[in-house]
A protein has these predicted regions:
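Nucleic-acid nuclease catalytic cores
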Residues: 124-125, 139-173
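Acidic-basic catalytic patches of nuclease active cores, encompassing PD-(D/E)XK
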Residues: 1-38, 47-100, 221
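Conserved catalytic cores of phosphodiester-cleaving nucleases, focusing on short active-site segments
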Residues: 10, 34-40, 114-122, 142
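Accessory beta->alpha helical hairpin/"wing" motif in late/C-terminal subdomains of nucleic-acid enzymes
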Residues: 99-110
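Amphipathic coiled-coil/heptad-repeat helices and related helical stalk/stem segments
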Residues: 81, 103, 128, 151-152
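Non-catalytic C-terminal interaction segments of nucleic acid-processing enzymes
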Residues: 12, 18, 26-28, 39-54, ...
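Catalytic core segments in nucleotide and nucleic-acid processing enzymes
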Residues: 132
């Protein structure tokens, strides 16, 4: 078995359960094998750039700013600032009048639901646990997925101390060996970006298609 086979088996499980997910989500601090989401607003604006969301958050907080204010805050060149601001304007989130930028729509009260990341490994459960901890910066919960025959080698205390959950994979079946603990370091902007990417890749997956699954306890009601 290859790690790709393990990931494909998990993907199959998620598809059968009607769960929205994305593979190899690149977040700068790591690439999670699988990131899934429950309950996020399906009309989430597709913002996948950290500076783009950060600038929007800054404008939203100040209500109106100048291009110069943004330059000073983010240490960006004027052309780059204009590029970001015009992108936000095209999305209908800000308006521009001369050099003044005003907020139009507040996206920071939108429901992001629950985001869960999974790191899949065949044997290196220690390395996987360390990687999974990084994903807590943009996920509410994080798991390591291992083949069922590898589970016997795992020191569960390491997972319990770090708050990382553990999944046993046998074929296309998943068993939760240890539940994950909620992240205390999940950053809203990073979560928005990761959730945005998952929603964008799952426009045809609807909540009513959900089936009972090992992650059901994390579904927001």
């Amino acid at each position: 078995m290859l790690e790709a086979d393990l990931v494909n088996n998990i993907n199959h499980y998620l598809e059968m359960k009607g769960i929205r997910y994305s593979n190899e989500l690149r977040m700068g601090i790591g690439i999670s094998d699988i990131t899934l989401n429950f309950g996020a607003n399906r009309r989430l604006k597709p913002l996948d750039d950290y500076f783009l969301v950060s600038i929007l958050a800054y404008v939203n907080k100040k209500r109106k700013v100048t291009f110069f204010d943004i330059q000073e805050m983010f240490l960006l060149g004027l052309e780059k600032v204009k590029q970001y601001v015009f992108t936000l304007a095209n999305l209908g989130l800000v308006v521009i009048k001369n050099t003044l930028v005003k907020i139009v729509k507040n996206i920071f009260s939108v429901n992001l639901g629950t985001t869960i990341s999974i790191e899949a490994k065949l044997k290196d459960w220690k390395g996987a646990c360390l990687q999974a901890q990084r994903y807590l910066c943009f996920s509410d919960y994080s798991y390591v997925a291992l083949p069922s025959e590898t589970i016997k080698n795992v020191d569960l205390s390491i997972f319990q101390e770090s708050g990382i959950g553990l999944l046993s994979i046998k074929g296309k079946n998943i068993e939760e060996i240890l539940p994950a603990k909620e992240s205390v370091s999940c950053d809203y902007i990073l979560k928005y970006i990761s959730t945005s990417k998952v929603i964008e890749k799952n426009v045809d997956v609807e909540k009513r298609h959900l089936r009972a699954n090992v992650f059901t306890s994390y579904i927001l009601t």
